[in-house]
């Protein structure tokens, strides 16, 4: 099952910046697996953002497990890191779209 998110260039930039994991901490096997998956999502989001040539909306495709992990990651990040109004609104919109399609 695949999930599609329709994003503008600015929204794709927010997603690419938020999905980037700076300094991972590995305490167990589960965290190493999650980091590996998030790294794949980060690469996919960054390539999607870099592929924009104009400000039109494009579809960003994720597999169900990638979308689920991204939703959990964004939810956790919003609780820990403070973002501006536009970034928070964009991240909540992405979480809502993922939740609607996975439900």
Question: For each predicted feature, which ranges?
Answer:
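Positively charged, low-complexity terminal tracts
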Residues: 1-103
